Amino acid sequence: MESYAYSLDEILAMSWDKKLANDLAQEIGSATGDKPDTVLEMRRFLALKGYRELLDRVSEACRGKSGDQALSAVAHAIRRYALERPALSAAAFQTAAVDCPEWREAHERLHIFMIDRFAECGLFGKAAENALNMLRSLVRGYMLHEIMHTLIGVDSYEDAFDKAVEVFVAGLPIFASAGRNS
């Protein structure tokens, strides 16, 4: 097993970003047998893995469900994934890089899946895109609060998130009517 230890001189001479990138590259190399040579390659690797895992999770979560029930199940699956795999979910929440067809394809597959869930709820076009952005913000916000324990007076983050998703889903008709008016 390789040692990833750095001497004090190396640590002081190297930016933390570079050290972390080197550590990640070594970890990825150990796990996959491939050695990413650049930070961009690592970002691609992590984003592709995150997109694929997240798509598997949300697909499984809404199996046998449709409409509001499917969307609620998807929201909970995204939150659970974000809590279990914060780095991969962060990579998957990013906008696809324009220089990598695999990244764009993985992003597009997840995006189409999500837009289809909103279509089941009567949202199309810009209304569906706006609702998707709001859902991403809702999930990220609750995930960050849960990780940092920053919501005061909350006994259960799960229960609080359940209520937030209920309110979000109940408000979807507002997006639908706004989409027809624009």
Please name every model-derived segment:
Residues M1-M14, R117-A119, M148-S182:
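C-terminal peripheral helix-coil segments that are non-catalytic and often amphipathic
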Residues Y6-S7, D23, D37-E60, A73-A77, ...:
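Alpha-helical structural segments
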Residues G29, R136-R140, L144:
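Amphipathic alpha-helical core segments of compact helical bundles
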Residues R79-C100, L144-L151:
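Amphipathic alpha-helical segments used for helix-helix packing
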Residues A97-G122, E129-M134, D162-A170:
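Amphipathic alpha-helical packing segments from all-alpha helical-bundle domains
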Residues A13-F45:
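Helix-turn-helix
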